[in-house]
Amino acid sequence: MNKFSVKLLDNRTVLNEILTGHWLISHSGLLQLGHFFKTVTQNNASESKETDRSESLLSFYDDNYNRIAPRSVSEIPEGSIAQINCVGPMMKYGNWWMLGANEVIAQLDFVNNLQNVAAIVIYIDGPGGAVSAISPFIDFAKRKKKPVVAICDASLSLHRWIPDAIADVQMADNDISARFGSIGVVSSWMDATKYYEEMGVKVHEVYPEESSHKNEIWRAIQEDEEKGKQMLRDMHLSPMAQKFQAAVKTAHPNLLEEEGVLTGRTFGAEEAVRLNMINRVGSMKEAMQVAKALAEAYNLTRNN
């Protein structure tokens, strides 16, 4: 009923995004990429395979907040709440090692179009992920038909931008481990030049006159590392960071722009509430109650 299959990406595609992509991710999340890199390179499976992760992503609750297990769409009672999980580092496309934005969006679209689902609660707990993963959520917000409440533990970097893009209300699920912020962008890569030189391998690159700007940042880094990095900041990282900051300010018009709020610092739940970064601290049941109230208000407005 609520199942969907997704063709997971092969090793080459995952490695390409890890090694060449830009990231909306916390420092701890960035360190996790080393583990994923090791896992991917040691795994000999290169064939794309079909899998189903819908059961771990999507649950349904009736209007009394009791979890239900409908076997078909017709068994979903009117006024139900859909609960979707968005947990762990994220790329744009799902793979064996990371959740994909495409998987979460597939479930959001599914419940967004179910008549008997009144509202959506999305549980967010992650350090961030690839910059490319945010666009599908921004696009979903344009076709959203129902209220969305985000309840979060770690809501950092990409996982901070996601609720800002799609949620009507944002909550922390605790005031102990919950963290918010890390609003910023980072580019990370590994330079294996010296390693290859010690192996006696020399890499040559030849460009025609018609490709004078091809790989210009990488070429500049090789010639003058700081100059090349400044080009990367100016041409790629700063524009992304500015869009991230603008999205945060749009989602939170009363945000207190204290030191670090928009430049990468992280905050606990109570501080996030004080800064108007989130609305409140509460439980999953309370998030569902808020979602139900929003749905009722939405229906009144629509009927009038």
Model-derived features: where do they sit?
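Small-residue-centered hinge/linker elements
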Residues: 1-146, 160-251, 294, 301
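Assembly/oligomerization interface modules of large self-assembling protein complexes
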Residues: 142, 156-158, 228-304
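Acidic, His- and aromatic-enriched active-site or binding-groove loops in soluble protein domains
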Residues: 153
